[in-house]
Amino acid sequence: LMVCYGGDGTLLEGVHRLCGAPIPVMGINAGHLGFLTSAPSAGLNLIFEEVAAGRLTTEPRSMIEATGDYAEQPDTELGLNEFTVQRHGAGMISVETYVDEQMVATYHGDGVIVSTPTGSTAYSLSAGGPVVAPTCACLVISPLAPHNLTMRPVVIPDSATITLRIDARRSDAFVTLDSRVYAIGQEAAFTIKRAEQKIFLAVPHNISFYDTLRNKMMWGIDIRS
């Protein structure tokens, strides 16, 4: 068991260090929101009693594998939440997007997010993407500030392979995997697909995904009451 004490960024760094090894990860929230670090820092003794008694729930979470034109990195990297392409300068970038070699759209704007179900409550949510239960077998493609009123997020099966072709000749661009930032050239291409490896999140047995949605994001809460 790996225990990450901090916020979601701490847990994502721990996941990166595991490199897909089948070791459960438990996040104890000492940060601000802590959606993935669902165990509260108050009452640590009770939490570790549950660990010792084997009362944790282990949830498998899918990861993504992104292969492409990193400037100074290996060709392939893994992520738990999302892969993003983002503009670095003032101008728009264009991202041709394909699913299983079929053209989906060319997104003109600030970039594109490819999210896992786990990452659907992170950056993708801020870009208007849907909340996806972590057990769903899908990926979400969300445009970032698209210069087109008809562009909306799209949900695809996680058996598909996504190809992104980036044209950033008018503005510098970079890509991210979770909290890690990578430089790229003006014209780069990446393929994103579900990774063979999974991450196993260990959570207290009395905390569900929907509990976390309500408690951390006020989901479904009537603010008038």
Residue ranges and their predicted role:
Residues 13-15, 36-37, 124-126, 151, ...:
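Short glycine-/acidic-enriched loop or helix-start segments at secondary-structure transitions
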Residues 33-110:
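Catalytic core of DAGKc-family lipid kinases
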Residues 7-10, 31-33, 118-120:
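Short glycine-rich anion-binding loops that position phosphate/pyrophosphate groups of nucleotides
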Residues 106-110, 114-150:
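Gly/Ser/Thr-rich active-site loops/lids in small-molecule metabolic enzymes
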Residues 13, 18-28, 35:
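Gly/Ser-rich helix-loop-strand patches that form or flank binding pockets
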Residues 71, 77, 85-86, 90, ...:
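ATP/nucleoside-binding phosphotransfer catalytic cores, i.e., glycine-rich phosphate-binding loops
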Residues 4-8, 15-17:
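N-terminal glycine-rich "phosphate-gripper" loop used for MgATP/nucleotide binding
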